[in-house]
């Protein structure tokens, strides 16, 4: 997240703070930011995720790769009472050991920052995209840096996409 700390979220504080997490944070003296405000990634990390990780303590696990998340006793076809079932999370640890964990809540913070979509609408790279790789940026640039600003100053720039990141790049 530190890589995109300069990016304003497209969701408000009211949408990115989970009520259960807020209850967990209440005894720590944490106060909910303005629900209507749109935080930057860095604000969200510093003001919410880090305090939440502290409140969760040793329940936060690191050094493992999540292979998949589902609901206990349910598959993609059986959806009756799906929301009432605990999550089952399959992880692989750095030493190769696999583990199955059960949870009432899962925070998915994986995002798409490291796996951006290619430019062609089919999900494949556009013709010529690989050849132009040195002139393509797949992330919202941090324009506070002089070198980054110089890269774009006085040039025509195409912003490809219809998602929030494309809009944020223009904002």
Name the predicted role of every residue range.
Residues 2-11, 101-103, 108, 171:
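Internal hydrophobic scaffold segments of catalytic domains
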Residues 27-28, 75-78, 129-134:
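Alpha-helix boundary/capping detector
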Residues 31-115:
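Feature captures the FAD/FMN-dependent oxidoreductase FAD-binding
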Residues 41, 108-171:
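Glycine-rich dinucleotide-binding loop and its adjacent helix/turn
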């Amino acid at each position: 997240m530190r890589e995109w700390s300069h990016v304003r979220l497209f969701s408000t504080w009211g949408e990115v703070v989970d009520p259960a997490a807020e209850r967990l944070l209440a005894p720590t003296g944490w106060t909910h930011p303005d629900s209507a405000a749109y935080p930057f990634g860095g604000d969200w990390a510093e003001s919410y995720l880090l305090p939440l990780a502290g409140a969760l303590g040793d329940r936060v696990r690191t050094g493992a790769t999540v292979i998949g998340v589902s609901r206990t006793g349910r598959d993609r076809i059986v959806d009756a009472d799906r929301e009432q079932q605990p999550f089952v999370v399959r992880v692989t640890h750095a030493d190769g050991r696999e583990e199955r964990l059960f949870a009432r809540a899962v925070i998915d913070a994986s995002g798409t920052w490291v796996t951006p979509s290619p430019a062609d609408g089919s999900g494949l790279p556009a013709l010529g995209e690989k050849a132009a790789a040195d002139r393509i940026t797949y992330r919202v640039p941090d324009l506070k840096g002089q070198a980054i600003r110089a890269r774009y100053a006085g040039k025509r720039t195409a912003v490809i996409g219809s998602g929030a990141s494309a809009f944020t790049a223009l904002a």
